[in-house]
Amino acid sequence: MKNVKTKKNKDGNLVLEYDKTSGMYITLMTSDSKLSNTNERHRFIKKTESIIRKSIQYKAYKKKIMDSGINMCAVLGNVTNEKAKVEMHHGPIFTLWDYVEITLQYLYNNNLPISTFRAADMILSDHFDDLIQVVMVSESVHKAIHNPTNNTLKIPLESAWGNLVGYLEKYKGCFDYKHFAKLNDYLELNKTNTDFDLFKTKITEWKDVKMPYEILKIEDIRHRQ
């Protein structure tokens, strides 16, 4: 979204700011692009997802996360890899499909060669830069999250690992209405959750790693003027 900007607050943290002087701009593929065809675009995204999930780097990143102490199910709490299979879920806001879409738009916006391997390499690099939000969950919980009938199981933002604001800063101008609506709806949904506060500065700390970031109130980043 081109009407979402970032700026540093008094503490030096990057925060999101909605520019009310501009309208909503949705960046789309041009009609002469092969990937403007829905079937071709979906085939591209699925292939990129497959390359990522099967890569050595992807497995190495999951190991890095689990070795750092993030090795328990974010929902069930006491379930570790020793008791049941713990999997890495992309969320709670953006899925791996979303990340491929956003990366694809970035390549297009910057007139860069578009290929599944280039997109996969960028997304894997973003994983290791801790820009991609992931949540560790048990296999059964993971299946429940992806169940299309599920409308109650939501993962708290504080349970995720990854710098959301840093990602939005890097890829500003590459989000379409669907992505921004996901962000908006998730924050709106969790505004009433009393278990955690989404609207204050967050310090995500796992062992010796500290990553501060701030999530603005929903009225500051809503997608309508």
Where do the protein language model's features map onto the residues?
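Cys/His/Pro-rich metal-binding microdomains
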Residues: 74-75, 135-139
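Short, compact, well-ordered microdomains
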Residues: 143-146
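A boundary/linker detector
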Residues: 1-82, 95, 172-225
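Residues immediately flanking
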Residues: 91, 140-141
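Short cysteine/histidine-rich zinc-coordinating motifs and their immediately flanking basic loops
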Residues: 83-94, 148-160
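Histidine-centered nuclease catalytic patch
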Residues: 78-133
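Eukaryote-specific, cytoplasm-facing alpha-helical/coiled-coil scaffolding segments in long proteins
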Residues: 164-173
